[in-house]
């Protein structure tokens, strides 16, 4: 699904943190954000994910305008360089953690944990701890 930013601007107290103009990123295209510290790379990602609201402009995924949608309705996730896995917990426990916090029933937690582990191809690693995984495996667990 194509990501399209149209005249996206974010101001903080009159200072422009982001002023993208308009551009799009095609589905499946690997894209990097490069620039010096403080140039707005993280702010742009926060805008796309819905963690910040733009001052002006629009954000589209495919034909869908997601500018006003809350983060949980956008279907977008971020995976940071520090994957924030709990080192004392197994892969299964890390994947299940959000569901446990929402007090979902045990059967649903087990089902969703297996489903997500299979989706990101870590089902053989469920009993391991993050320190026993490669960086790529840790990233896939964080995505799950």
Predicted regions and their residues:
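ABC family nucleotide-binding domain
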Residues: 1-144
């Amino acid at each position: 699904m194509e990501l399209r930013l149209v005249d996206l601007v974010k101001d903080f107290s009159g200072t422009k943190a982001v002023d993208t103009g308009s551009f799009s990123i095609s589905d499946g295209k690997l894209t990097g954000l490069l620039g010096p510290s403080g140039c707005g790379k993280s702010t742009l990602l926060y805008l796309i994910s819905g963690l910040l609201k733009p001052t002006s402009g629009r954000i589209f995924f495919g034909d869908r305008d997601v500018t006003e949608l809350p983060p949980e309705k956008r279907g977008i996730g971020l995976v940071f360089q520090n994957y924030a896995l709990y080192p004392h917990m197994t892969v299964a426990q890390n994947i299940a953690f959000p569901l446990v916090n929402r007090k979902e029933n045990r059967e649903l937690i087990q089902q969703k944990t297996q489903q997500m582990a299979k989706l990101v191809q870590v089902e053989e690693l469920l009993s391991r701890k993050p320190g026993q995984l490669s960086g790529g495996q840790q990233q896939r667990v964080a995505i799950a």
